[in-house]
Regions:
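Extended hydrophobic leader/signal-anchor segments used for secretion and membrane insertion
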Residues: 1-129
Length: 129
């Protein structure tokens, strides 16, 4: 049986989106434990910009976990990425090949609504489910 990361990577490499429930508090209040996100594939550096929220393989966590954090800058050909909930921490640098996709939708428990997030951040659809 294929693991979640292999399956996610395979679907994204075929140009399809992936939707799954997240856990953890590193992106609160933007994305909370239990929210459902949709990520789309990225194929070029132009797909990833300042303020975008990306899903990437964290190389230092056990089992190279899939993690969702925000792009906060660039260093050469690397993207500087860090969680929203840890603004005091220095960002880590990741290459394009480490980034699997970009978050384009967040679903929150409850009734349906839609809005756009601005002020230098990725415009993402929010929906209550």
């Amino acid at each position: 049986m294929p693991d979640f990361i292999a399956l996610t990577r395979d679907v994204l490499e075929k140009g399809r989106s992936v939707r799954f429930q997240v856990w953890g508090s590193s992106m609160t209040p933007f994305i909370k434990d239990g929210d459902v996100i949709t990520i789309v594939p990225v194929s070029a550096e132009s797909d990833i910009g300042l303020g975008k929220v990306v899903a990437f393989l964290h190389p230092w966590l056990t089992g190279r976990r899939l993690v969702v954090h925000r792009v906060v800058g660039r260093r050469g050909s690397s993207f500087l990425i860090r969680p929203d909930h840890a603004l005091g921490h220095d960002p880590f640098a990741y290459k394009l090949c480490d980034i699997l996709g970009r978050v384009v939708r967040v679903e929150i428990s409850g009734t349906h609504y839609s809005s756009r997030f601005r002020q230098g951040r990725e415009e993402i659809d929010f929906h209550r489910r």
